C-alpha cells in the first residue's frame, strides 16, 4: 500500500508542481532521512532529473523500483521501470538496456486492469520506437493503445502525450496534414491549460518542433520554438530546451542564419555533454553540417567522428564524401543510412535518397539513380511540402543533367529554384542555381548560364559558403565567350543525330556527348570543364562507353563510333 504523505513529502510534491527543483530535492531528502519510501525516492528522482543529476536519478529510481517490488506494488514498479527505460536511452545512450526496462514494465502490468501506468508505458514505448528505431507503424499502434487507456482512466496528460506521439508518427510516415492537425490539437490543449504534467507539456511541444523539422515547415517551428523557450525559462526546464534547441538550430541553418545556428549548437552541445552525453551526437552532426556548408570539411569530418555511428552521422559522412568528389563513398554511406530507416519512415528517407540520386548519377549508375529518384518523387508527392518537392525537383534535374537530358534538367532545376525560394532556403537556392547554370551551359545558353552562376556566387558569398562558391566560380570561368555559340547544337559543336545507332549499343545521350569530345581530342579534365562534370564522373562515362562498345582504349572507342555513324 502507498505510504501516507508526510509534511516533507507534501512540500516536495508542491515544489515539483511549481518547478522549484532544488527545493523539491531538499524536501524529499529530508523525508528520506526519516524513512525510505518508494514514493519519496520517485519524487527525489524527478527533481534530480530536471536538475540533470544523472547519478542521483539512477540511484533513486532503482531503489524505488526495488522497494515497489518488495511491497508487491507492480504498478509502481512498472511506472519507475518506464522512467528507467527513458533514462538509459537519454542519459547513457543504451537502447538495448532501455528496451529491457520497457519490456520489464510490460510484464509487470500484464495482469493489471487498465491504468495510467499502462498508458504511460504505451506512449513512451511508442516514442522510443519512433525516435530510436524510426518505426512509425509500430509507434502508431502503441500510441493508439495509450490514448485509449488514458481516456478510459481519465488521464488527460497521457492522452494528449499519446496524441502528440501519434501526430509525429503520422507526419513521419507521410500523412502530414493529419499528423499536424493532431499536433495542433495537443498544443492547443497545452495553451488552454488542460495539461498539468510538465513532462507531458514539454514533450508535446518538442514533438511538434520535431515534426516541423522533418517536413521543413519552419514557419510553424519558429512559433513553437519561441513558445517552448519561454515555457522552459518560466519553469526551469533547461534539459528540455537543450534538446529542442538543436532542432531550432536547423531552422536557423536552413534560413541562412548561420551565426545563430552556431551559437545555439555550441550552447546545446555544452549543456548536453555535461548532463546527457548520449544525446550530444545530434548537436554534433548538425554542427558538422554547418561546417560542411561553410566549406570547413576537415572540421566537419572531426565533428562527425565525435558523433559516432548514429543515423544522421552516416548521412553527414555521405554528404562530406560527395563534397570531396568521392561519389562511391557517398553512395555507400547514404545506402547504409537508408538500410537503417524503414520504408514507412518517408520523411527521414528523403534526405538519403536525394544524395543517392546525385552520387549514383555521378557514377553513371543510371538504373540505381532512377530507382532512388522514383522513391524520392513518390515521397514528395505524398508529403507535398514545398521543401520536399524542391528536393525532388533538384534531384530530378541533377539526374537528367547527368544523362545529357539538358532541357529536361533545366525545367526541373527551374522548379527547384522557385520552390527553394518559396521555402526561404538561400543555400539550397544557390545550389539549385548552380546546377541550373550547368544545364543552361550544356544547352549553349551561355549568357543565361553566366547570370545564374553569378546569382549563386553572390548567395554563397553572403553565406560564407566557401567551398560551393569556389565550385561555382570555376564553372563560371570555364564558360566560353557568349558569342562562341548560341544555337541548338551539342557542346561538341555537332548536331543531334538519330538515336537508333546509339540505342543499339546502349549509349545514353550524355555518353554520346562525351564520345564526341573524346573524338575531338579532349582530355578528361577538359571534358569535365566543357560539360560541367567532375573529372571522376567523366572517367566513369568513358569507362562505360568502352564497355558498351566492347573496346579497351579511347582510340578504339572513337574508331568503333565512327563505324557506327555516332560521330556524324
Predicted region positions:
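Tandem amphipathic alpha-helical repeat scaffolds
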Residues: 11-17, 39-54, 78-94, 117-135, ...
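Residue signature of alpha-solenoid helical repeat architecture, marking inter-repeat boundaries
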Residues: 2, 35-38, 42, 71, ...
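Helix-turn-helix DNA-binding segment
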Residues: 402, 411, 435, 477, ...
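Residues within the DNA-recognition helix of helix-turn-helix
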Residues: 60, 452, 541-544
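Amphipathic alpha-helical segments of tetratricopeptide repeats
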Residues: 25-33, 62-73, 86, 102-110, ...
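Single-residue signature of alpha-solenoid repeat helices
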Residues: 24, 57, 97-98, 139, ...
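N-terminal regulatory/sensing modules of transcriptional regulators
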Residues: 327, 358-362, 374, 398-406, ...
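TPR-repeat structural position
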Residues: 21-22, 54, 74, 94-95, ...
Amino acid at each position: 500500500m502507498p505510504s501516507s504523505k508526510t509534511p516533507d513529502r507534501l512540500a516536495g510534491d508542491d515544489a515539483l508542481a511549481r518547478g522549484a527543483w532544488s527545493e523539491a530535492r531538499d524536501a524529499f531528502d529530508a523525508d528520506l532521512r526519516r524513512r525510505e519510501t518508494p514514493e519519496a525516492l520517485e519524487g527525489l528522482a524527478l527533481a534530480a532529473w530536471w536538475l540533470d543529476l544523472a547519478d542521483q536519478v539512477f540511484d533513486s529510481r532503482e531503489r524505488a523500483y526495488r522497494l515497489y517490488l518488495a511491497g508487491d506494488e507492480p504498478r509502481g514498479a512498472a511506472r519507475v521501470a518506464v522512467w528507467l527505460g527513458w533514462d538509459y536511452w537519454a542519459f547513457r545512450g543504451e537502447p538495448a538496456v532501455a528496451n529491457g526496462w520497457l519490456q520489464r514494465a510490460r510484464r509487470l502490468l500484464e495482469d493489471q486492469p487498465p491504468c495510467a501506468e499502462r498508458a504511460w508505458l504505451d506512449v513512451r514505448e511508442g516514442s522510443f520506437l519512433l525516435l530510436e528505431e524510426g518505426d512509425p507503424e509500430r509507434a502508431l499502434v502503441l500510441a493508439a493503445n495509450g490514448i485509449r487507456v488514458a481516456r478510459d482512466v481519465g488521464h488527460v496528460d497521457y492522452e494528449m502525450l499519446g496524441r502528440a506521439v501519434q501526430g509525429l508518427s503520422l507526419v513521419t510516415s507521410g500523412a502530414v496534414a493529419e499528423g499536424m492537425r493532431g499536433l495542433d490539437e495537443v498544443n492547443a490543449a497545452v495553451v488552454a491549460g488542460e495539461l498539468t504534467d510538465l513532462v507531458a507539456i514539454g514533450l508535446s511541444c518538442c514533438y511538434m518542433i520535431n515534426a516541423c523539422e522533418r517536413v521543413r515547415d519552419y514557419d510553424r517551428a519558429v512559433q513553437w520554438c519561441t513558445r517552448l523557450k519561454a515555457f522552459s525559462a518560466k519553469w526551469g526546464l533547461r534539459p528540455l530546451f537543450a534538446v529542442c534547441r538543436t532542432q531550432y538550430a536547423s531552422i536557423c541553418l536552413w534560413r541562412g542564419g548561420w551565426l545563430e545556428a552556431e551559437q545555439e549548437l555550441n550552447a546545446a552541445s555544452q549543456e548536453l555533454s555535461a548532463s546527457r552525453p548520449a544525446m550530444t551526437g545530434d548537436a554534433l552532426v548538425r554542427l558538422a553540417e554547418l561546417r560542411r556548408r561553410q566549406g570547413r570539411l576537415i572540421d566537419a569530418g572531426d565533428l562527425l567522428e565525435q558523433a559516432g555511428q548514429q543515423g544522421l552521422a552516416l548521412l553527414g559522412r555521405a554528404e562530406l564524401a560527395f563534397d570531396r568528389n568521392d561519389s562511391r563513398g557517398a553512395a555507400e554511406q547514404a545506402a547504409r543510412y537508408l538500410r537503417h530507416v524503414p520504408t514507412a519512415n518517408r520523411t527521414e528517407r528523403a534526405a538519403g535518397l536525394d544524395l543517392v540520386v546525385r552520387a549514383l548519377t555521378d557514377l553513371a549508375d543510371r538504373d540505381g539513380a532512377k530507382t532512388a529518384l522514383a522513391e524520392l518523387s513518390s515521397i514528395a508527392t505524398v508529403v507535398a511540402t514545398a521543401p520536399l518537392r524542391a528536393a525532388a525537383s533538384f534531384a530530378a534535374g541533377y539526374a537528367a543533367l547527368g544523362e545529357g537530358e539538358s532541357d529536361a534538367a533545366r525545367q526541373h532545376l527551374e522548379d527547384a529554384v522557385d520552390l527553394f525560394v518559396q521555402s526561404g532556403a538561400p543555400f539550397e537556392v544557390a545550389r539549385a542555381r548552380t546546377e541550373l547554370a550547368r544545364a543552361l551551359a550544356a544547352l549553349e545558353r551561355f549568357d543565361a548560364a553566366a547570370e545564374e552562376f553569378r546569382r549563386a556566387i553572390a548567395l554563397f558569398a553572403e553565406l560564407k559558403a566557401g567551398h560551393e562558391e569556389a565550385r561555382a566560380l570555376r564553372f563560371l570561368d570555364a564558360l566560353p565567350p557568349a558569342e562562341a555559340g548560341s544555337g541548338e547544337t551539342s557542346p561538341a559543336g555537332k548536331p543531334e543525330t538519330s538515336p537508333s545507332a546509339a540505342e543499339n549499343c546502349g549509349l545514353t545521350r550524355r555518353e554520346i556527348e562525351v564520345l564526341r569530345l573524346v573524338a575531338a581530342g579532349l582530355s578528361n579534365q577538359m571534358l569535365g570543364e566543357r560539360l560541367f562534370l567532375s573529372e571522376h564522373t567523366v572517367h566513369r562515362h568513358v569507362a562505360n562507353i568502352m564497355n558498351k562498345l566492347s573496346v579497351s582504349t579511347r582510340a578504339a572507342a572513337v574508331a568503333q563510333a565512327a563505324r557506327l555513324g555516332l560521330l556524324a
